[in-house]
Amino acid sequence: MQMYSNGAEIYPPNFQNIISIVMSASEEYLTYTAVTISSILRHGSKECHFDLIVLHQQCFSQEGINLLQQVTNLWNNCTLRLLCVNRKMEAYYVSGHVATETYVRLLLPELLPNYDKVIYLDSDLVVLRDISELWFLPVDRDIMLAGVADLDVIGQYCGTEFSMRYYINHILKLSQPEKYIQAGVLCFF
């Protein structure tokens, strides 16, 4: 495992069939992050090398670092790196009710300029299939970001939930609210 501080340049590791996956976590979420990583590796193709990058704002405890190492040490086809982003996040306004880990995914092109493609995953989900299926999906190269429609939000917008309609129309000012995406699984190109 490697640890990087603010502003460090990170390059993809020198392996064949690399799949780069980024998560953002706090100390309180490391147990969930370990489960997410374990599920990626358990179901992932043994032919691929998983380049796992965990973004964080506060230093993790040694116990938390040991937990992540225990999980990744079970597999020989992964690299784990921790990237501190606290200085980068200081420059941005963050709403009080939303964790900064939610916002950091939007900075991935800036944080990882040496990457052509990364998958961003929330650090509290379980991957039940080989994530290489998502990695190798053909995508139009004019696209910067791919995500899945957030059917719950779209349903609220189209239904009787006035506050959601107001939020999307007047706060977010989305011109196509039916294309609102869920941000827990994203592909950046």
Q: Residue ranges of each PLM-predicted region?
A:
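Glycosyltransferase catalytic domains, chiefly GT-A lineage
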Residues: M1-F189
